[in-house]
């Protein structure tokens, strides 16, 4: 008796060639609905599944493969006499090869399918057949990915059957595939049918391998890059690389951080970043001037940095950027001349990202791994209204200082805590990131500012991501000549800090919102 294969696919890629090959090898093919129509058109002999079950497809195809004559043929163990006896008693012939892929749930969702359309794209029979076949992989070969047709065909042609090793690998792949498929459905339905004030008791996330990496944060660490099952358009995961080597683990982390900073600015802006901290941010009326500001902010740290521009890279801007070593440049687009200039640098990575979708990226939850678990939170993307800020001091900030405070407050949100930043209204001047005490971060930011041209320091302000716990911070700020501060407020010693500002003639604004970043 010839061996039997069951083929039921939504993705018809490569199926005709595969079916022809196994038919030539003597396999009998059972098929369903649309798959049968394709095979019939190519004149490949096949049997309709209802001829096997004796039961017609019904309910618009919702019920067609959920039948004992199918699942018994998949699940029956060939090494157990009791199973083989049951199969004989019920006239069940074994099925040794299952080729199934699932209804395009993800594709329909990304295309904006209605709720009714999404429900119809929840595959029931397909996952059931895949799981049954995968469970019985000791005897059954199961294929859920057209990319695996060739390796199955190769073994069948050579040996008449597949190896246990291949069947085991394909079975594991099936359970990854169906788990991912169900995770997307669970995610969709959880969002569609929320329970008020209730957290889902299970968190189901699915990611697809985007890139295997040479190593992780350090050479002794292995790493891979996975993309969310529902892609975020404005993201490093969805970027398009035009030139250069593959991204490293650290490249991806830094590029992601830089994209998050750039997302907050609508005017022409350039962000320069190193080790997850901004080292230069500049805004201007045009992108070339914005580059000048970002570069001048810290011409030392920018070396080997990650650059994000929120406008097309022009020839003039490219000429300037090409004069220093940069790891990555990300922009919406590049002029022809700019691309030619930058592509001459062998080691630079040039990428594009769709900036028109940046607001949509704000909806994605942030997931952080810890030993034994995950932390999940919304992004820190609350829209703030500076008109609601409170002037806490006797001295009122000038209009120019208020504009600088708005800029500083956007920028300091992305500095690692304890985070301090000194800016004017269009440019960062000094960054003090990641110290375990706030006065340490203040000193670093002020030291970086001290070597700037006096003209750049005019109307400079200082921003702090969280409140000042002690007035000693104000003493340091006053020594540097800073005359305006923006911070959340909220310390039990706020009054001491306010009095220190009044003593030094410093204007200070409370925003009421903290922006820790760890």
UniProtKB/Swiss-Prot annotation:
What does the entry list under GO cellular component? cytosol
Pfam families cross-referenced by the UniProt entry: AICARFT_IMPCHas, MGS
Q: Where is the MGS-like domain?
A: 1-144
> Keywords for this entry?
Hydrolase, Multifunctional enzyme, Purine biosynthesis, Transferase
- Coiled-coil ranges per UniProt: none
State the EC number(s).
2.1.2.3, 3.5.4.10
> Which catalysed reactions does the entry list for this protein?
(6R)-10-formyltetrahydrofolate + 5-amino-1-(5-phospho-beta-D-ribosyl)imidazole-4-carboxamide = 5-formamido-1-(5-phospho-D-ribosyl)imidazole-4-carboxamide + (6S)-5,6,7,8-tetrahydrofolate; IMP + H2O = 5-formamido-1-(5-phospho-D-ribosyl)imidazole-4-carboxamide
| Domain of life per record | Bacteria
User: What InterPro entries does the entry give?
Assistant: AICAR_Tfase_dup_dom_sf, Cytidine_deaminase-like, MGS-like_dom, MGS-like_dom_sf, PurH-like
What GO terms describe the biological role, i.e. biological process, of this protein? 'de novo' IMP biosynthetic process
GO MF annotation: an example? IMP cyclohydrolase activity
Query: Which SMART domains does the annotation name?
Result: AICARFT_IMPCHas, MGS
Pathways per UniProt = Purine metabolism; IMP biosynthesis via de novo pathway; 5-formamido-1-(5-phospho-D-ribosyl)imidazole-4-carboxamide from 5-amino-1-(5-phospho-D-ribosyl)imidazole-4-carboxamide (10-formyl THF route): step 1/1; Purine metabolism; IMP biosynthesis via de novo pathway; IMP from 5-formamido-1-(5-phospho-D-ribosyl)imidazole-4-carboxamide: step 1/1
* Family to which this protein belongs: Belongs to the PurH family.
Which PANTHER family does this one have?
BIFUNCTIONAL PURINE BIOSYNTHESIS PROTEIN ATIC, BIFUNCTIONAL PURINE BIOSYNTHESIS PROTEIN PURH
- What's in the domain note? The IMP cyclohydrolase activity resides in the N-terminal region.
Q: What is this protein called?
A: Bifunctional purine biosynthesis protein PurH
User: Corresponding gene?
Assistant: purH
């Amino acid at each position: 008796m010839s061996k039997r294969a069951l083929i039921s696919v939504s993705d018809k890629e490569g199926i005709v060639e595969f079916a022809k090959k196994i038919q030539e090898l003597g396999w009998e093919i059972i098929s369903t609905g649309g798959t049968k129509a394709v095979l019939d058109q190519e004149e490949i002999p096949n049997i309709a599944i209802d001829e096997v079950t004796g039961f017609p497809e019904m309910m618009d195809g919702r019920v067609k493969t959920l039948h004992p004559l199918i699942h018994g043929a998949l699940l029956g163990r060939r090494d157990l006499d009791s199973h083989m006896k049951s199969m004989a008693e019920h006239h069940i012939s074994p099925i040794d090869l299952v080729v199934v892929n699932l209804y395009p749930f993800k594709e329909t969702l990304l295309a904006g399918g209605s709720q009714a359309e999404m429900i119809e794209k929840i595959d029931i029979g397909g996952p059931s057949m895949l799981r049954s076949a995968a469970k019985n992989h000791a005897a059954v070969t199961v294929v859920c990915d057209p990319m695996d047709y060739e390796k199955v065909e190769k073994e069948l042609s050579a040996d008449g059957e597949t190896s246990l090793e291949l069947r085991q690998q394909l079975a594991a792949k099936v359970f990854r595939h169906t788990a991912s498929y169900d995770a997307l459905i669970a995610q969709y339905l959880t969002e569609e049918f929320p329970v008020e004030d209730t957290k889902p008791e299970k968190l189901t996330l699915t990611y697809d391998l985007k890139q295997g990496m040479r190593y992780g944060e350090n050479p002794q660490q292995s790493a891979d890059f996975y993309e969310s099952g529902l892609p975020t358009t404005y993201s490093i995961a969805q970027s398009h690389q035009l030139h250069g080597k593959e991204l490293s683990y650290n490249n991806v982390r830094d590029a992601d951080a830089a994209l998050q900073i750039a997302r907050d600015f609508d005017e022409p802006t350039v962000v320069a970043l190193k080790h997850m901290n901004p080292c230069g941010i500049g805004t201007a009326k045009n992108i070339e001037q914005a580059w000048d500001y970002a570069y001048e902010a810290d011409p030392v740290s920018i070396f080997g940095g990650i650059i994000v521009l929120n406008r097309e890279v022009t020839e003039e801007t490219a000429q300037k950027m090409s004069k220093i070593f940069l790891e990555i440049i990300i922009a919406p687009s590049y002029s022809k001349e700019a691309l030619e200039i930058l592509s001459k640098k062998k080691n630079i990575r040039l990428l594009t990202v769709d900036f028109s979708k940046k607001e949509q990226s704000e909806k994605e939850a942030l997931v952080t791994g810890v030993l034994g678990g995950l932390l999940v939170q919304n992004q820190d993307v609350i829209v703030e209204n500076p008109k609601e800020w409170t002037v806490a001091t006797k001295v009122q900030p000038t209009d120019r200082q208020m504009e600088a405070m708005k800029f500083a407050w956007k920028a300091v949100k992305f500095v690692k805590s304890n985070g301090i930043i000194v800016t004017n209204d269009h440019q960062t001047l000094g960054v003090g990131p990641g110290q375990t005490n706030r006065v340490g971060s203040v000193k670093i930011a002020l030291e970086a500012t001290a070597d700037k041209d006096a003209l750049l320091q005019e109307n400079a302000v200082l921003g702090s991501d969280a409140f000042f716990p002690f007035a000693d911070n104000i003493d340091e700020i006053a020594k540097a000549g800073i005359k305006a501060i923006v911070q959340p407020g909220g310390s039990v010693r706020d009054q001491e800090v306010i009095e220190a500002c009044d003593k030094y003639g410093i204007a200070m604004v409370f925003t009421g919102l903290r922006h820790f970043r760890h």
